[in-house]
Amino acid sequence: MTSLDFSTILPEVVLAGYALAALMAGAYLGKDRLARTLLWVTVAAFLVVAAMVGLGNHVDGAAFHGMFIDDGFSRFAKVVTLVAAAGVLAMSADYMQRRNMLRFEFPIIVALAVLGMMFMVSAGDLLTLYMGLELQSLALYVVAAMRRDSVRSSEAGLKYFVLGSLSSGLLLYGASLVYGFAGTTGFEGIISTIEAGHLSLGVLFGLVFMLVGLSFKVSAVPFHMWTPDVYEGSPTPVTAFFATAPKVAAMALIARLVFDAFGHVIGDWSQIVAALAVMSMFLGSIAGIGQTNIKRLMAYSSIAHMGFALVGLAAGTAIGVQNMLLYMTIYAVMNIGTFAFILSMERDGVPVTDLAALNRFAWTDPVKALAMLVLMFSLAGVPPTLGFFAKFGVLTAAVDAGMGWLAVLGVIASVIGAFYYLRIVYYMYFGGESEGMTSRMGAVQYLALMVPALAMLVGAISMFGVDSAAGRAAETLVGPVAAIEQPAEAAQAEPVQGE
């Protein structure tokens, strides 16, 4: 390892060093006595590493012979992932302490999961991709089953582990096919092989299997089966984490793989991604209608939103990737605010997740109800909230790429999905007489609700440079907008060239 390699992976080294030091400190200095302190130190560590990544004077480069890539795309995804993880940990502190759930291992395992996510988005090789993905997955299996005294939590962890192992096997099988037919595991080598005209059927099959394995991580249909049960059974802070940082990292990883390794066959993979997007948008929108548990409802919401993000990716253009990154950023912010509210829901000191508990909540706490209304409108894509512009961006990218049919289906799915978000608003403002709930929040949790709600309104006016940062990140991965051939045009041009 050279000094250049070390400087390239310095943020990851810092986070890994912190996680190991915290693990040793917790084991030797009194375990759960340090739990709350370790949680807040972990939040600080995430923010420090995010500052190192986002504010440092970086030069795009690679380490370990191209296995690890440091560029604008990876830095943007890392900052969003780190800040989202910090937000979830911070808003969960009071809740976990009140429920006697806070253990010193929790923030450390989350830190290790985030470390895996950082490697995922910087992967330049199939081996790095798998290493980062498994580091994240193994940590998430543990936190899903964190409540060992809860049958539902143990069940959630087991389901996630079994289906996660299956997806990892499919991913490995696809990677082995690509390696066998391309002769290399490096993304640069794979795309060079394809560019030289050696695109075999085996490589395409390998790509399909890898996309199947990665679709599990973003809960894309038909690989979403684990999501509702795991979201409902896991402790609510863990569900909040599942719904934010891992989704951002996994979507960024898919973008990294398809553009860096398979960027010359956009016409081949964009149709697969588009099919996943359509199925996810519609199943998430329709299946969520009949849900009565808000955590389970948010699981189907997550499935639908991943479908919309995949629309931007299916466009196969820099503007599509830019809007996908913006969509995932806005999605993470919306979910932090929504889960801050869900964490506060209780009746007689006991957490509740039943939608009926929201009946006439606006009458008892109008400020929090208004914040939740804004977040629900944004999740539904109602103008003028930021969620509307996020959906508009990815659908516009699809139209520009010659995939107008995909945009039309996206609009239909969005209209269907708006029902269950607006139903929550209906319960809060016009629900029937029933035993209600109280909303108990600490100061940090209150901020975690109010700041995202305010951002959904203010962001419609100005995103304070986040949109331009996403644009630069997309151009780093894909290239300038003008230099990108549209997938539909590429697919039509290929047969002509062969004649």
Curated annotation (Swiss-Prot):
Its EC number is 7.1.1.-. Keywords: Cell inner membrane, Cell membrane, Membrane, NAD, Quinone, Translocase, Transmembrane, Transmembrane helix, Ubiquinone. It is an enzyme of class 7 (translocase). The keyword Transmembrane helix applies. The chain crosses the membrane at residues 9-29, 37-57, 76-96, 104-124, 126-146, 161-181, 196-216, 235-255, 269-289, 301-321, 324-344, 369-389, 402-422, 446-466. The keyword Cell inner membrane applies. GO terms for molecular function: NADH dehydrogenase (ubiquinone) activity; NADH:ubiquinone reductase (non-electrogenic) activity; quinone binding. This is NADH-quinone oxidoreductase subunit N. It comes from Paracoccus denitrificans (strain Pd 1222). The gene is nuoN.
